[in-house]
């Protein structure tokens, strides 16, 4: 479960950076 959370966190960070 933790691994999945990390992936979501990475995507979220990238989304913010693009915004």
Swiss-Prot record:
Function: Inhibits insect alpha-amylases.
Organism name: Delonix regia (Royal poinciana)
Protein name according to UniProt: Alpha-amylase inhibitor DR3
GO MF entries: alpha-amylase inhibitor activity
Lineage: Eukaryota, Viridiplantae, Streptophyta, Embryophyta, Tracheophyta
Superkingdom to which the source organism belongs: Eukaryota
Alphabetized UniProt keyword annotations: Alpha-amylase inhibitor
């Amino acid at each position: 479960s933790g691994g999945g959370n990390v992936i979501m966190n990475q995507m979220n960070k990238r989304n913010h950076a693009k915004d």
